[in-house]
Amino acid sequence: MSGHSKWATTKHKKAAIDAKRGKLFAKLIKNIEIAARLGGGDPDGNPSLYDAIYKAKKASMPADNIARAVKRGAGAEDGAANYEDIVYEGYAPAGVGLIIECLTDNRNRAAAEVRSTLTKGNGSLATSGSVSFNFERKGQIVVPSEGVDFDKLFETAAEAGAEDVTDDGEVFTVVTGPSDLFTVRKALQEAGFDYDSADQVMQPKNEVELSLEDARKVSKLIDNLDDLDDVQNIYSNWTASDEVMAQLDEE
């Protein structure tokens, strides 16, 4: 299984990185608020909140920001927005399928911005089900590979119920069934493995391999969608050769 479609990133100048950091914090805060609202403000009894907080800490979010987000979500502090989940399906250039997950307090704004961004990037919105049939919900745990024994990780994950472990270079990716995510994550923690994130994701069943030119177009469109405030996650079914990925990383 290729990891390119999940881990492909392009390098940005410092200003762009700083801007993305601010947007990342906003997305992480939304995740924390929603998790606390749905499952309560105690991370020990709310695995989704535990993972949302853990991911925010990994991104170096200040502890005070995290604590306030938990309180807002749990109703202990005013200021929480009334977010709703919306999922859009779309196409990028070269027939690449996109699933765009939004958390928004304004459905009309989210729809207009997603549609406009897709159109400007030579993509389009798709009817419900026309893209998602090629994806399936999975749990995904990302483990930094440095200093980690792959065989030990694989054995620990498999015994806990994981479906697969792949070597994606700087990280190992543990794939689970959606209901097994927390069990496998806990088993890895107890075995001493550090991890970057544990999330529910949409994994493509089939991937489209792109040329450098098409990969540039699709990457730019996904970046522009990710910049939208209402967009939380984007999943796609594109991949590319190692040579193409190396060229993208240099740009």
Swiss-Prot record:
Location, primary (coarse class): cytoplasm
A GO biological-process term: regulation of DNA-templated transcription
Record's subcellular location: Cytoplasm
InterPro entries reported in the protein's UniProt record: Integrase-like_N (IPR017856), TACO1_YebC-like_2nd/3rd_dom (IPR048300), TACO1_YebC_N (IPR049083), Transcrip_reg_TACO1-like (IPR002876), Transcrip_reg_TACO1-like_dom3 (IPR026564), YebC-like (IPR029072)
Keywords assigned by UniProt, alphabetized: Cytoplasm, DNA-binding, Transcription, Transcription regulation
Superkingdom classification of source: Bacteria
GO CC annotation terms, alphabetical: cytosol
UniProt xrefs under SUPFAM superfamilies: YebC-like
Any one Gene Ontology molecular-function term assigned to this protein's record: DNA binding
Keyword Cytoplasm tagged: yes
Family stated for the protein in its record: Belongs to the TACO1 family.
Entry-linked HAMAP family: Transcrip_reg_TACO1
Name of this protein: Probable transcriptional regulatory protein BL0726
Organism lineage: Bacteria, Bacillati, Actinomycetota, Actinomycetes, Bifidobacteriales
